[in-house]
Amino acid sequence: MSNAITMGIFWHLIGAASAACFYAPFKKVKKWSWETMWSVGGIVSWIILPWAISALLLPNFWAYYSSFSLSTRLPVFLFGAMWGIGNINYGLTMRYLGMSMGIGIAIGITLIVGTLMTPIINGNFDVLISTEGGRMTLLGVLVALIGVGIVTRAGQLKERKMGIKAEEFNLKKGLVLAVMCGIFSAGMSFAMNAAKPMHEAAAALGVDPLYVALPSYVVIMGGGAIINLGFCFIRLAKVKDLSLKADFSLAKSLIIHNVLLSTLGGLMWYLQFFFYAWGHARIPAQYDYISWMLHMSFYVLCGGIVGLVLKEWNNAGRRPVTVLSLGCVVIIVAANIVGIGMAN
């Protein structure tokens, strides 16, 4: 396995670790509605950071974006909005299926759809099947899916042991939302694929290869921001028990506390895709679809590890932890299989 591929896998791991940890600061926010908290973090992660970093990277910010036709920018934006819909459905999936089943089904579907649809759309899926390296990477995707399934099973065992239940369990509604979440969340993978002309243009301007994907986040995350912020603002305006004014009428020290924590959560959310861009840049072009598989499977891996570190599994008993450990090992094996396949 070449050093470039190894570093690509490593940066995807770092990005996934940030994704697995980003919600921790949000949990410490006090006396704010979820909608206010999510909006503040979202403004940081989807608007401020993408714009600020792109302004630093690009020699002429406005000239860069105006150089693309609407036919180039619109698919990138719409796929970003598609991801935004999946992001909202994610929370509803947890509500009706519970954490373990919800995450397992949603992540499993988005892993398959986001990984395999890209080469199908690009018309080179047959090349993957017909080459040894391609078949090896596809095997890695299958093994990763098995690993996600095992971790999901561990979560179910944990919830059963600890008596944790879904907020409003509804299998039919939850499964529909999980499938929708999985499909729509893959919009981020499709957006990255559609944004290749933007990446190439950034490279032509002298932007370092590790950073060429970052300017496209202004458009991608702009699409996601409109969906997420629109959802939050509509609820803040229409739901009687929610009030943006009330949330910002608290003691000044508490407002600062909440803003700082929400900002930190937003920063950590953004960092997952900052390092995703670094990892993506190191993956061979013919296997760039693998970036999504690495990110999603490592997200599940890191989520399990973070849960162990935070002692969330302490009262779950030995069997769930053993199953979780097995699932994590399978995901690591999957990453190695994919790495070997790309090296071939």
Curated annotation (Swiss-Prot):
Annotated GO biological process: rhamnose transmembrane transport
Means of activity regulation: Inhibited by protonophores and ionophores, but is insensitive to the thiol reagent N-ethylmaleimide or cytochalasin B.
Main location: membrane
Entry's induction text: Induced by L-rhamnose via the RhaR-RhaS regulatory cascade. Also induced by L-mannose or L-lyxose.
Keyword NADP: no
TM ranges: 4-24, 38-58, 74-94, 101-121, 137-157, 175-195, 214-234, 259-279, 290-310, 323-343
Membrane topology term: Multi-pass membrane protein
Keywords: Cell inner membrane, Cell membrane, Membrane, Sugar transport, Symport, Transmembrane, Transmembrane helix, Transport
Keyword Zinc (UniProt): no
Cellular location(s): Cell inner membrane
Domain of life: Bacteria
Family: Belongs to the L-rhamnose transporter (TC 2.A.7.6) family.
Protein name: L-rhamnose-proton symporter
Biological source species: Escherichia coli (strain K12)
